From Swiss-Prot:
Highest taxon of the lineage: Viruses
Compartment(s): Host cytoplasm
Oligomer and partners: Homotetramer. The tetrameric protomers further assemble as a square grid.
This protein's name: Chimallin
Main location: host cell
Originating organism: Escherichia phage vB_EcoM_Goslar
Keywords on record: Host cytoplasm
GO CC annotations on file: host cell cytoplasm
Biological function: Self-assembles to form a proteinaceous shell that encloses the viral DNA and compartmentalizes proteins and DNA during viral infection. This micrometer-scale compartment contains narrow pores and is the site of viral replication, with the proteins involved in DNA replication localized inside. Provides a surface for docking of capsids during packaging. Probably protects the viral genome against host defenses.
Amino acid sequence: MGLDVRNNGNDNVEIRAAETRTAQRADEALETAADFAGQPKVTHTMRTINRTLSRRISRNTGSEQVLNLRRLMEKYLEDTRFKDDFIFVAVDPNQYSVPYPTLVVMSGAKVGDHNHFFGYVLPLVAGLAPLPRREEQGPHGNILVPRTWVDNLNGTFINEVMAAMYAAIGGKSNGTARIAGLAVVTNEITAESAHLATTLLSAADNAIQTAIEIRLGDKLGLPQFNLGMMASDQPISSVQYNTSGMQDSDIVGNPVRSDITVTISNRIRQAMSDYDSQQRLVATTGYIDLTYSPQNPTFNQGPVLVNGYPVPPTVQYQPRYVMTSAYPLELDAFTPNTFVLGLIGTIATLNSGMAWAQSLISNAARGIGPHNPGALAMVLDPEVTAPLDLSTQTNEQIYKFLQQVLYPSLLISIDVPEEGEYSWLLRMIPAAEKIYTGKVEGEVREISEGYKALYRAFDDVTLGCFSKKYQYGLPLVYATGNRIPLGHYNHQDGHRHDIRDMDDLYMMNITNPDTVEAWEDSFDRTDMTMSQRVVARHEIIDRVLSGSWEQTGWAMRYDFDPLALQALIEAAADAGFTIRPENIQHLAGTAVRGNMAARARGLGNISGNIYARSDRPNVGVNNMGGAFNLF
């Protein structure tokens, strides 16, 4: 990689308190990090005491886990040509003001005479007690807001981690350091954790290499993925509707709701052969949720039109596809452009003949249960007091039933984890929500880096066709103002399930109308602060599950602008990209790729409450500091 500075005294496998720094160097590096991150300098009393009264072996067992993880990663790299490309930096709570023992995996690239280092941060929290709730003042009294480990990873944490990174490379004069990504490790790390260590190292390398492409790609001449790399008549999309109850999992084994999995593959024609092979490129997972959206009952207006046709007056719910994860399959790299490929495939596939509705039909086939759409019968007829069993109905009959209560358009949303394997990449979604920075030069407002990154990815992937259809500066995503708890509970099938199983249909089937209304208000009541809605949602989950669930993190939910998605799909088609859908059951005629976006656009004009954005500040949102943001 041509870097001048590698471990710089941090090569020894054993982790000792003064291994890579003197007290003076650590303080100087900390000040450098604070300047670089734009964060205030802070006093580090605990670190100073521990440094004065230090011992060669720490009582903090987390240090042993950091050592185990580092050893396993170094062992994996021993026989590779990349073993000298990585720096492993231990950030010990006894030496730095960090809440958890942390390992930073560093690597980078050289541009001219300057070294650029990027670090992937792995806080280890196994065995630690949950954080106590934070008291927050609300308009009607104080509330206790739930917290998870990520809530401690604030600007001070970033400063301290960067201080350790700068100390490891010998200071700012030897290069620039940035944080490429962060994933909290909840697993206990032992000598037997080789597979997990390799997985984490792979995630770190992916994040670092993508950070290099984002920050330095133009200077280094690095290639970017686009649709021109795929033969126009070969891409294949397939969709799987999860009927087994088994769910995907994230990098540390937490379940991820995956009712729907969309996979994009490239069909590779074999010369002199009677068969073709497929290379699976990228996949997305998610589920269909419902958002209450009545037809303007307070106004005397005509019938609601979707795609030029009136919808039945009984229609009250907007279907929403919530993307819970996106990840590469047989690709090693995951970049903004390959994410956009997955997004294109997901939109086109689920909109193919309203294929998204098949997920609800699959749930109906299971009969009475927590996600049975037969509960919508109580919406259609007040005299119906219990969910209907639709398992004996045909698919066509169930679909006609759904048409009576659901809008025919699909809202596309994504949950962006505040930390996790690919949170560093998905952070371009919230970064893109803020279109302008607030700076004005002349009469031109400055566009934010996040917006530039997402718009550029849309345009690059479609070979420049997106910019011909969608004006630069128009919205790409909207913040819903909802902080979504991530975690798991023990399902009756004996497996751990994603806490996002708790959705509108779940509440309709398991609880009562008052709880359903309170649940919907916890997402849509813009007169409540985000913290108030989070607390209300937590209280409902606690009641339904009798408190037997564990929260592991947070995600922020964003909606994609339907006009931007329509332009993206049309741009992909103009770029010569055509998808061959496989194992998809059409429920609404032939597949017309642009119809979903057109229907959703019409719906957006008459039901603005779909985008439930609060005008109140998002108090309590984790702020990872400027150094963490690639965009």
